[in-house]
């Protein structure tokens, strides 16, 4: 192996030995690593002998170098991919947990609010039903009282009317009896006078007869009340 091949091999070896200890910037910059790989390959390509054995050996060394240079970036990319996947999975998991917590809290708040409104509506409905029942009972009571008062007034008016009719009838009967009494009293007085006159005539005739028989004279009063 020529001095140039050894130099290229030593350079590749140094790059290979230094590669695991590269800084985070180099490990996270695949472009820079690929550029270094290309430079090393170009230098090795210029120094390789055109003989078959040396060419095969040089090709093998190049393949080894390529594998050595490509393995760390792929590993870094894989690690970064896995890390990013873990971060995304963790973020999505945390976001999902937060969303579930928010949805659960909102659901609980909605249920509590619904229960509160349902309880208030139930109590209000019960109060309205109770008030409506009380109002109905009061209306029925007032209606019954009004009907009773109306019935009492009607009965009172009917009774008063009957009493007025009875009083009117009694007054009419009293007037009729008073008129009859007045007429009968006049008739009885006339009859009494006629009876007294007839009695007086009879007594006068008897007196006249007695005078004719020479009896002592009597006064008119004696004749009337004898």
UniProtKB/Swiss-Prot annotation:
Compositionally biased intervals (Basic and acidic residues): 1-18, 39-48, 56-65
Expression (tissue specificity): Expressed in lymphoid cells.
Keywords tagged on the record: Coiled coil
Spans annotated as Disordered: 1-72
Ranges in coiled-coil conformation: 155-210
Pfam families, per database record: Cor1
Signal peptide residues on this chain, from the entry's feature table: none
InterPro entries referenced in this protein's UniProt entry, alphabetically: XLR/SYCP3, XLR/SYCP3/FAM9_dom
The keyword Coiled coil belongs to this UniProt entry's keyword annotation: yes
Record field: compositional bias (Polar residues): 21-30
Stored PANTHER family: X-LINKED LYMPHOCYTE-REGULATED PROTEIN 3A-RELATED, XLR/SCP3/FAM9
Family: Belongs to the XLR/SYCP3 family.
Name assigned to this protein: X-linked lymphocyte-regulated protein 3A
Gene name of this polypeptide: Xlr3a
């Amino acid at each position: 192996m020529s001095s140039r091949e050894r130099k290229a091999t030593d350079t590749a070896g140094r790059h290979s030995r230094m590669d695991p200890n590269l800084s985070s910037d180099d490990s996270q910059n695949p472009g820079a690593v690929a550029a270094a790989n290309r430079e090393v390959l170009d230098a090795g390509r210029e120094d390789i002998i055109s003989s078959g054995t040396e060419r095969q050996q040089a090709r093998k060394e190049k393949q080894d170098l390529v594998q050595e240079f490509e393995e760390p970036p792929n590993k870094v990319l894989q690690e970064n991919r896995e890390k990013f996947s873990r971060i995304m999975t963790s973020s999505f998991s945390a976001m999902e947990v937060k969303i579930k917590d928010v949805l659960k809290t909102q659901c609980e708040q909605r249920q509590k609010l619904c229960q509160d409104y349902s309880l208030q509506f139930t109590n209000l409905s019960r109060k309205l039903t109770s008030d409506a029942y009380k109002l109905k009972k009061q209306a029925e009571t007032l209606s019954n009282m009004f009907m009773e008062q109306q019935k009492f007034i009607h009965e009172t008016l009917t009774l008063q009317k009957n009493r007025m009719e009875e009083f009117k009838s009694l007054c009419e009967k009293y007037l009729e009896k008073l008129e009859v009494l007045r007429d009968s009293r006049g008739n009885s007085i006339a009859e009494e006078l006629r009876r007294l006159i007839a009695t007086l005539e009879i007594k006068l005739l008897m007196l006249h007869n007695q005078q004719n028989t020479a009896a002592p004279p009597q006064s008119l009063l004696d004749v009337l009340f004898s």
